[in-house]
């Protein structure tokens, strides 16, 4: 079962704005050596909205090759076009991804029947597991717990959810409707601790781009019901969890990664570089977590 800390990987770019393949592979390797439980390329944090389909597919291929089955690869395969999502999911399966992460369609605002149709089409097209990505703040729509229940009941490869609603009670509601084996991963570092207490089994994390060891330790503690240890780790990470979202992501987490020498800060427009004020707050958060030393 997929569980623990799974990094929503950033996509490093070179000075010309092209994908820095060497930096990406080195970054994935560092994540694994730091003890991360899984990686998720080409999601929101990976700047999927500004990647071409060719770049999207290439990153998945690079990630699968670098990981070499040491941890699960949960490849982003979302689109607001069902046919495009099916194409991306098929490619991820062919490339060797262990699962796909599929966001609810954004902008065109389908109803619950439309959501069911979208995800059922993808489930019929591939055999690897599907994680539903429910993030109303970005997609405008919220998948109802009942729709999720129907999808996991009707399609055995729809196995879980990345829940970025920020509502920790959702974990209990989804556990009740979808069953105890339904894989519930938080999509929000700030509320992941509480989400886990309600039945979650980990987080697809932004902060773990720079703090994979701490994040893995936090979620391991949760899985062992050691919430005293988890709370101490959460206290270390909370300023970072907040700071990297002061300005539109992933500018903040890329800046943090650059401070640790992991990649450059370049983001693709319309995301823009950070203000000096935000940089200072992120620096302070990195010191607080012990990731930067005086």
Swiss-Prot record:
The gene is dapA. GO terms for cellular component: cytosol. Keywords: Amino-acid biosynthesis, Cytoplasm, Diaminopimelate biosynthesis, Lyase, Lysine biosynthesis, Schiff base. Transmembrane segments: none annotated. Gene3D superfamilies: Aldolase class I. Catalyzes the condensation of (S)-aspartate-beta-semialdehyde [(S)-ASA] and pyruvate to 4-hydroxy-tetrahydrodipicolinate (HTPA). Its EC number is 4.3.3.7. CDD domains: DHDPS. It catalyses: L-aspartate 4-semialdehyde + pyruvate = (2S,4S)-4-hydroxy-2,3,4,5-tetrahydrodipicolinate + H2O + H(+). NCBIfam families: dapA. It is found in: Cytoplasm. Pathway: Amino-acid biosynthesis; L-lysine biosynthesis via DAP pathway; (S)-tetrahydrodipicolinate from L-aspartate: step 3/4. This is 4-hydroxy-tetrahydrodipicolinate synthase. GO terms for molecular function: 4-hydroxy-tetrahydrodipicolinate synthase activity. It is an enzyme of class 4 (lyase). HAMAP family: DapA. InterPro entries: Aldolase_TIM (IPR013785), DapA (IPR005263), DapA-like (IPR002220), Schiff_base-form_aldolases_AS (IPR020625). Homotetramer; dimer of dimers. The record marks 44, 107 as: Part of a proton relay during catalysis. The active site is at residues 133, 162. One of its GO terms (biological process) is lysine biosynthetic process via diaminopimelate. It comes from Bartonella henselae (strain ATCC 49882 / DSM 28221 / CCUG 30454 / Houston 1) (Rochalimaea henselae). Pfam families: DHDPS. Pyruvate binds at residues 45, 204. SUPFAM superfamilies: Aldolase (SSF51569).
């Amino acid at each position: 079962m997929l569980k623990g800390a799974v990094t929503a990987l950033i996509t490093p770019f070179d000075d010309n704005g092209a994908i820095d393949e060497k930096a990406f592979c080195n970054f994935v390797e560092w994540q694994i050596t730091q003890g991360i439980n899984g990686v998720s390329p080409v999601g929101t944090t990976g700047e999927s909205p500004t990647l071409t389909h060719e770049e999207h597919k290439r990153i998945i291929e690079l990630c699968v090759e670098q990981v070499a089955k040491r941890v699960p690869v949960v490849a982003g395969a979302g689109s607001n076009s069902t046919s495009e999502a099916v194409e991306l999911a098929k490619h991820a399966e062919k490339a060797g991804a262990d699962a796909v992460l599929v966001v609810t369609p954004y902008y065109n605002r389908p109803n619950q029947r439309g959501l069911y149709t979208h995800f059922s089409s993808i489930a019929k097209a591939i055999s690897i597991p599907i994680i539903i990505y429910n993030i109303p703040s970005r997609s405008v729509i919220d998948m109802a717990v009942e729709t999720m229940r129907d999808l996991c009941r009707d399609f055995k490869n729809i196995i879980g959810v990345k829940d970025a609603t920020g509502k920790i009670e959702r974990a209990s509601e989804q556990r009740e409707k979808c069953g105890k084996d339904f894989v519930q991963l938080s999509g929000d570092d700030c509320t992941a601790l509480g989400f886990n207490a309600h039945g979650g089994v980990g987080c697809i994390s932004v902060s773990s781009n720079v703090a994979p060891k701490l994040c893995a330790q936090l979620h391991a503690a949760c899985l062992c019901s050691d919430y005293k240890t988890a709370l101490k780790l959460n206290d270390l990470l909370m300023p970072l969890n907040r700071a990297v979202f002061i300005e539109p992501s992933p500018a903040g987490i890329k800046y943090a990664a650059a401070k640790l020498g992991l990649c450059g800060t370049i983001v693709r427009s319309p995301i823009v570089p950070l203000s000096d004020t935000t940089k200072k707050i992120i620096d302070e958060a990195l010191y607080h977590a012990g990731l930067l030393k005086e």
